[in-house]
Structures are given as structure tokens and as C-alpha cells.
């Protein structure tokens, strides 16, 4: 099978695997109601590749559908700093929702500046690996059942072939679903 036909190609899995609240035993209406109770300032917790960014992307789509202006900032190990243009956007955050993916990447000084600038925002939702200064909206903890859902969603026709390997891969990659999807890609070559 060539790369273009592989059902587990990264661009395809990212397109297909959007956040499914029911897989986390919740609903979007429950999450939004909880966010409102937390005064629209909360954090999404979870280990690396647990679905935090996927949830944040779904949240951004939901906000866009409801005509809510958004400032979305993505940080990771390779990109740890907020850019000058993003800092400028944050100075104009009143009435906007700020989504910060990877808050723990910021230095103490940057974090302090970020929270000062986000005070007047209409809402704030961040992702972290461990609890920080905001109340927790949800803690994503993937399990092997979610992995099975993902495989069935991406490639139902290959599920029976891949299913026997999933427990082994789950252990090998310590529950990192993204890495297991790459393993599925290799298995389909």
C-alpha cells in the first residue's frame, strides 16, 4: 500500500479524529456549562498526546460557529515562546476568547505577563500536563477503549487485523495514541 492510500497517514487521521466528548464520558454541553461555572477561565489537563490539542481545536470550531472571536496560541517543546505579534494580540484581548495550547512551555516571566494580559479576555482555556493556577475543566486520560474507537473510526476495514496488536502497542507506547496510530501506519505498508 502506498502512503497516499494508507488510512493511517497523519494528515488523514488528524482530519478524521476530532474530539469526541462521549469517548471521555462527557458532552460538549456539559463541558461548556462547566466552563461557564468556572467563569470561562479553566485548564484542560492530560499527559502528552492525550487529546488536549484535539479538544482545544474542537472548542475553537465551536466558538467560531457561535461567532466568538478567538486568539489561539500553540506552544510545544520546539516553539516555547509567544511571538511578538501574539503578544500584541493579547494586549487587544478584551471581548475575545484566548486558547493557549501548552501553557507549561512558558517561562515564569512569560506566564506572569500572559495572565496579566488575559485578565480582560472574555474567556481563557489552556492546556497543561499538570494542574496549574486555573481550575480544571477536564482531565483527559486516554484508555485502550479510546484507542479501539480511534482505529474503528479511521479504518474500520482494517480493525480486525489490527485489534490483536493493540494491547501490545498500548504497553509499548505507554498509551500514546498518536504513536500507536503511526505503528498502524507502518503495519499497513
Model features per residue range: what roles?
Residues 63-79:
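Conserved catalytic segments around the Walker B and adjacent sensor/switch elements
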Residues 162-189:
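Amphipathic alpha-helical "lid/sensor" segments that cap RecA-like P-loop NTPase cores
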Residues 38-58:
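Walker A/P-loop nucleotide-binding motif
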Residues 1-39, 183-189:
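A short, basic N-terminal segment
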Amino acid at each position: 500500500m502506498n502512503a497516499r492510500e494508507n488510512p493511517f497517514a497523519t494528515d488523514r487521521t488528524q482530519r478524521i479524529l476530532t474530539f469526541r466528548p462521549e469517548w471521555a464520558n462527557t458532552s460538549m454541553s456539559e463541558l461548556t456549562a462547566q466552563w461557564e461555572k468556572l467563569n470561562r477561565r479553566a485548564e484542560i489537563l492530560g499527559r502528552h498526546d492525550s487529546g488536549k490539542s484535539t479538544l482545544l481545536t474542537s472548542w475553537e470550531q465551536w466558538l467560531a460557529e457561535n461567532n466568538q472571536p478567538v486568539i489561539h496560541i500553540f506552544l510545544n517543546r520546539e516553539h516555547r515562546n509567544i511571538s511578538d505579534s501574539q503578544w500584541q494580540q493579547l494586549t487587544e484581548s478584551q471581548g475575545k476568547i484566548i486558547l493557549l495550547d501548552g501553557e507549561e512551555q512558558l517561562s515564569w516571566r512569560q506566564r506572569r505577563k500572559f495572565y496579566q494580559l488575559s485578565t480582560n479576555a472574555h474567556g481563557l482555556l489552556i492546556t497543561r500536563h499538570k494542574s496549574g493556577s486555573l481550575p480544571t475543566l477536564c482531565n483527559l486520560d486516554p484508555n485502550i477503549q479510546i484507542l479501539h474507537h480511534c482505529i474503528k473510526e479511521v479504518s474500520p476495514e482494517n480493525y480486525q487485523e489490527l485489534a490483536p496488536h493493540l494491547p501490545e502497542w498500548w504497553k509499548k507506547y505507554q498509551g500514546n495514541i498518536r504513536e500507536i496510530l503511526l505503528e498502524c501506519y507502518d503495519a499497513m505498508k
